[in-house]
Regions:
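Conserved alpha-helical scaffold segments that buttress catalytic/binding sites
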Residues: 2-301
Length: 301
């Protein structure tokens, strides 16, 4: 029996210096997410948006640790963690709508409270900077490093997810890395699948390996879908677009592979970085909605 999906909005842009992603949850809902999931046979409940305080001039203010709005990010992620934890304990699948990618810290921490798990990270970026290595100070470039306790995050209990096993993490579709990120990732036990590897081997084989990595020896996995994983020609409404991303059909094929896994093994899922200000006729939010419904089991036949 398929589990109910609990939709949770996290309208935050603390993790980026570009405004607009805080409107992502509204844009995705406007694209008909709830109705499409219902039509696919999934029961849903939408708890609305979690409270996110607004800060005047937030795009200019940074903390001494070179991680902008880290305290505000912590507060939001702790709210997300509590809601996701309750969702998992209720036997439902938490579907987190971002917001910038820093929200993943809350989602994964909430989902790992039950037992250890893996993660498949669909992203153009590594998200593996730390406050001391980040060239921008934007926390949306740090969530994976934060969850795995790298650098200063090792002392931040709210960020570090001890139940996320590094050897069970796979990043899919990477095509741009900072120098320090590249070094840290090479030294880690994370499996990194670049777009070049997808070009060479084919997406189906790469995603199969990523899912195998995420589920090896654990009973659950998390899916983090950053919409900049896709090529900006089909997903223009993202904050940090990078050319050469996944095509429309590749993205759906990947999400369909996620859906082929045992329903009980999908611990949580999030879709992030939809920026309606930069979008064209809500195209990116529409695509996000389609991909989420594919990941949760929608079928043509």
């Amino acid at each position: 029996m398929q589990r109910t999906v609990r939709i949770i909005g996290a309208p935050t842009d603390y993790g980026t210096n570009r405004r607009g992603v805080d409107m992502g949850p509204s844009a995705i809902r406007y694209a008909g997410l709830g109705d499409r999931l219902d039509e696919s046979g999934r029961q849903t409940t939408d708890v609305g948006d979690l409270f996110v305080a607004r800060t005047a001039g937030q795009s200019q203010r940074a903390t001494d640790s070179n991680a902008r709005h880290l305290e505000e990010t912590r507060e939001v992620c702790e709210r997300i963690e509590a809601e996701v934890k309750d969702t998992v304990e209720s036997g439902e699948i938490p579907l987190l709508l971002g917001g910038d990618h820093s929200v993943a810290i809350g989602t994964v921490n909430g989902a790992t409270r039950e037992s250890p798990m893996g993660a498949v990270w669909f992203d153009a970026h590594g998200d593996f900077n730390t406050p001391s290595t980040s060239p921008s100070g934007n926390v949306h470039g740090m969530p994976l490093a934060g969850l795995l306790g790298y650098g200063e995050f090792g002392e931040m209990d709210w960020a570090r997810a001890d139940g996320l096993r590094e050897e069970n993490v796979a990043i899919v579709g990477v095509r741009t890395l900072d120098e320090h990120e590249r070094k840290l990732l090479r030294e880690s036990d994370i499996s990194v699948f670049t777009m070049s590897e997808i070009d060479t081997r084919g997406l189906t084989d790469v995603v199969a390996d990523a899912l195998a990595t995420a589920t090896d020896g654990v009973d659950g996995f998390h899916v983090s879908l950053d919409m900049d994983w896709l090529d900006p020609q089909i997903a223009p409404g993202v904050g940090t677009p990078v050319r050469g991303g996944a095509t429309y059909r590749e993205a759906h094929a990947a999400m369909e592979q996620v859906a082929e896994r045992d329903d009980a093994s999908l611990r949580s899922i999030e879709v992030v970085e939809v920026n309606p200000i930069l979008d064209e006729a809500n195209e990116t939010a529409e695509l996000a909605t389609e991909l989420v419904t594919s990941a949760l089991g929608k079928r043509i036949y």
